[in-house]
């Protein structure tokens, strides 16, 4: 059943954004919540009636801003803007990201500072409710002046042009409009610019990456706890007193997560008096590394939740004062930097997970487990190449984690001479999260294999539940077999939340 999301000005929460990414929603907007938007549209009409020249309303754009456009050509100006700016390329963005882009654009316009009529806002909302999602090429934005090309493709169907995704098929825009009960619109003054200008593409991509990163973080924390018991590691490094002395919030919370997962483990109780004094960093320093990653994800979540409710087009209309002001809210630097933070966290989450897998397959460091976690080594190779796969994915993410926000390239004849690269910064996150999930999937299998070698001893109750879920899908490795399907099965468990800690890590963001 499709959920209903009631949109109000500046009312989107992180929970709402997750819901939009999770599946179809029906948008509901109360008539009173369109009043501010209608007031801003009236202000635009008054400016035109007064004969004033105002950028974006009766002028050209970018370097052509000094060109005045006559009143009888203003509708054509807005149409031309959408057509000329729909110049993206590459594969289409995922449907869930496009759905969120539409919701973010509606939320921004509802604030009432963009000069867009309620009719246009309702049309965008109708596309969401009908799950008629515009086909938006993923490449073509530098994150200033806004996400112009992606947003042009997003609104192209309102003119009856372009394509939409409908019931899993790509169809002409006319079919999507019909499904939403709409007809092609003629855009009014400034409306094309308001629809195209903004950070909604990069923000939607970054939010999708954030949610995927949270899943990867949580699964890595669970797999890391399993690896501790598989390698007969110590839980002493997770003592709350250690982390309280440092005072880093993410570290404190991560350590608490490990304590909850490991509490009551018979494996741990079996080796309390062993001679090993310290574990490798990949086990011992998990709260420090994962906690720092958590802090980055939480900070990024706060930035993106703010941006989701922001007004980021230009110029901005202030109906109470009758002013229309040009600024730079379209510059997506906050989104770019938030995406860079998520990328760094994803790279480190995967890097640490891969190191734990490498430790588990190494007979010199894994607490007495067989080499590559398989008996009859030599005849069997066990987890040898699965660990190499994890290493390959970890190295890919290291390259992808290079900060995008430090890059800039001038555009529009040097009028737009510094850009954020936010869309690329955000777009790579889904690939990085997918890589991280693959790395953690390998560790999850390796850790469960290590736990089996500790039988009849058992791990803690929550970790035994995860082990059981894995073994429902993937059997014990008593000999070599085709490995790739098992990695995909473990990835499926992670995606389904069956290897989760049950903690909402971003709740306090």
UniProtKB/Swiss-Prot annotation:
Q: According to its UniProt record, where is this protein located?
A: Cytoplasm
**Which Pfam families does this one have?**
Lyase_aromatic
Report the EC code(s) recorded for this entry: 4.3.1.3
Involved pathway(s)? Amino-acid degradation; L-histidine degradation into L-glutamate; N-formimidoyl-L-glutamate from L-histidine: step 1/3
How is this protein named in the record? Histidine ammonia-lyase
Give residues where 2,3-didehydroalanine (Ser) occurs.
145
Q: List the disulfide bonds.
A: none
